[in-house]
Amino acid sequence: MILNISVSLLIFLAFYGFSSDAKSLPCSEVKKEYGIVCRCNATYCDTIEPLGTVTSGKAVVYTTSRNGKRMNRSELKHTTSSTAKTKVYVNTTQSFQPVMGFGAAFTDAAGINMKMLPQTMQDQIIQQYFSDDGLGYVFGRVPMASTDFSTHEYSYDDVKFDFDLKNFNLTVEDLQYKIPFIKKAMTASGGKLKLFATPWSSPGWMKTSGRMVGAGELLGDQNGKYYQTWAQYFVKFFEAYHAQGIDFWSLTPQNEPTTGIDPLWKWQTLFFDASMERNFIKKLLGPALASSPVTKNLKIMINDDQRINLPHWPNVILTDPTAAQYVHGIAIHWYEDFIDPATVLTETHEKFPDYFLLATEACAGYFPADGPKLGSWSRAEQYANDLIKDMGNWVGGWVDWNYILDLQGGPNLAKNFVDSTIIVNATAQEYYKQPIWHVMAQFSKFVKPGAIRVGINIIEKSVDVEGLSFLNQDGTKTVVLLNKNEVLSFDVAISDVSAPNVIYDLTIQPNSLITIVYK
């Protein structure tokens, strides 16, 4: 009995009972093929040492690195001079976009893997992601029906020619794998969770191909009954979730719409080009959403595809006043970022400054699809680099793909196995927090919704050091710096342009990410 009480107390303190003076539980390190992971089970999981009170003249530093540091906390006192060659100047008079927040997707695969673990571990994982003591995620992406990260293709109405959607119903996947965990996340976030929905395909009977999987577009005329039914399908979805006690903040009309023309595409998709999406929004989807009290305030994000589509996609849609009245943002994915530079995001913002930019999907191990690499630092660095590039070019928030997968990187009906921030080993009843998880923490813990990105100037910098700076609503400033060099450390001096003699001196180690919070 004493042992059981001790274990329960440990779990409670680890995930629910932090005070500002609490210490963290360190990473339970396990060396895997590609590096170090943090092992968690029903009785133990590492936690993040709280920031505490940040006072003038003191900085708090968190470090995550290839060599095993995982959100290690330290403190610095300011100096009045520095010999560091790399100077970082923060300029709070130069302001950019507000921060929207960070998040992940509630896929079938994630829910299936959660169900492989006991209730205590399920609750741990939700707390690790969505509570203030964890990553503090505020976004949840919810697929409408099946994706490749499902075990089979299904829609909410697979009855042919049911144009009135009389047979529309949520499925067992929603009721078992999505809704329970969404509700837990809503609670863990303290009501701050913002959900947005995205379809991968219409029911197969609505498509030219006759199947959800593979290329195809909606049948018939763009104002015809198939398109009309598809618009009403969205309303039905949101009303069904509303009946379950879940309301949404936003939606996108289609996940990666340009893939729907690829004859070799192996999972669910539906083709739209920019003009088709414009017409669908302005003539059918926008009016349909506006007609229901449940959906009338939903924010539509366009594109939800690679940034290679920019600025063409918003040029087509947002220059049409009727379509534009329904649109609030532009969604981007990261999979072809190597083709177009991040500056295309700034170009898009400058053309359409009234519309936010949100990164809505990313995962490592996708090209080729080779599943998880346990302990991989290079994948963690991929995330950090993309976060810096995106947010440095007007992207307001960043949403990861599956929040948990198995050791294979699934389940996935197309064998499109990829990586995730958390990987579950159901046989051992444990899970592994990848370095990616802690990289996300370096941003999401200290760059809160409502913060403003501010100016940063790195002088005499190495090409391997890059970063961002933010002004938080509580008056603290956050600087995130990434060192991509595998060998060299860099001495860095951080100061405000407005207070050049208040300097924080530190060394950023090879292959490391640091976050500095000061006032």
Swiss-Prot record:
Its EC number is 3.2.1.45. Gene3D superfamilies: Glycosidases. Residues 1-24 form the signal peptide. It is an enzyme of class 3 (hydrolase). Keywords: Hydrolase, Lipid metabolism, Signal, Sphingolipid metabolism. The active site is at E256 (proton donor), E361 (nucleophile). Pathway: Lipid metabolism; sphingolipid metabolism. One of its GO terms (biological process) is glucosylceramide catabolic process. It catalyses: a beta-D-glucosylceramide + H2O = an N-acyl-sphingoid base + D-glucose; a beta-D-glucosyl-(1<->1')-N-acylsphing-4-enine + H2O = an N-acylsphing-4-enine + D-glucose; an N-acyl-1-beta-D-glucosyl-15-methylhexadecasphing-4-enine + H2O = an N-acyl-15-methylhexadecasphing-4-enine + D-glucose. SUPFAM superfamilies: (Trans)glycosidases (SSF51445), Glycosyl hydrolase domain (SSF51011). It comes from the Eukaryota. GO terms for cellular component: membrane. Belongs to the glycosyl hydrolase 30 family. This is Putative glucosylceramidase 4.
